[in-house]
Amino acid sequence: MFNKIPMTLRGFNKLKSELKKLKYITRPCIVKAIANARQLGDLKENAEYHSAREEQSFCENRICEIENKLLRAQIIDITKIPFKGIVIFGSTVTVLQISTSNIFVYTIVGDDEANYKEFSISIHSPMSRALIGKKKNDIIKVNTPTGYIKYIIKKIEYI
């Protein structure tokens, strides 16, 4: 049974772009590197050859992984979901940490799209689990290694 993988259209397109790069740029370069390394002689002690083969293995595995994810992708367009006013997958949520008054803005995305530097958090993260289904001005508690942290939901956007 194939489990669907929730992702945004942006995440789906990002994976498609990576797949295209791997297939049409990276893979041909690796094939050339293997051919060049073969010309250097004995393959048993040819570091360039073994390095290129290892890179080829990584590339082929990543291609298979991406193709599988794209096949199982369930693209969720939150602009077409009538759940306005509550936090759902794909929402961009502004929260205020009660103890510090720091403001954070997070977008809830699929596992493959999560990027903490871009404040995109996985649907399976503790923060997302605390946010899903909540409304503006709700107080949430997020379990962290140092204890619970309380936040107030200040804004919910569906971008």
UniProtKB/Swiss-Prot annotation:
Question: Which BP terms from GO are recorded?
Answer: DNA-templated transcription elongation; regulation of DNA-templated transcription elongation
Alphabetically list the UniProt keywords: DNA-binding, Transcription, Transcription regulation
Kindly give the Pfam families that the UniProt entry links to this protein. GreA_GreB, GreA_GreB_N
Gene3D superfamilies, per database record: Transcription elongation factor, GreA/GreB, C-terminal domain, Transcription elongation factor, GreA/GreB, N-terminal domain
Q: Which domain of life is it from?
A: Bacteria
What one GO molecular function would you report for this record?
A: RNA polymerase binding
Tell me its family.
Belongs to the GreA/GreB family.
Summary of the function given for this chain in its UniProt record: Necessary for efficient RNA polymerase transcription elongation past template-encoded arresting sites. The arresting sites in DNA have the property of trapping a certain fraction of elongating RNA polymerases that pass through, resulting in locked ternary complexes. Cleavage of the nascent transcript by cleavage factors such as GreA or GreB allows the resumption of elongation from the new 3'terminus. GreA releases sequences of 2 to 3 nucleotides.
Entry-linked NCBIfam families: greA (TIGR01462), PRK00226.1-2 (NF001261), PRK00226.1-4 (NF001263), PRK00226.1-5 (NF001264)
Protein name, as recorded = Transcription elongation factor GreA
In its UniProt entry, the species of origin is given as Buchnera aphidicola subsp. Cinara cedri (strain Cc)
Q: Which gene encodes it?
A: greA
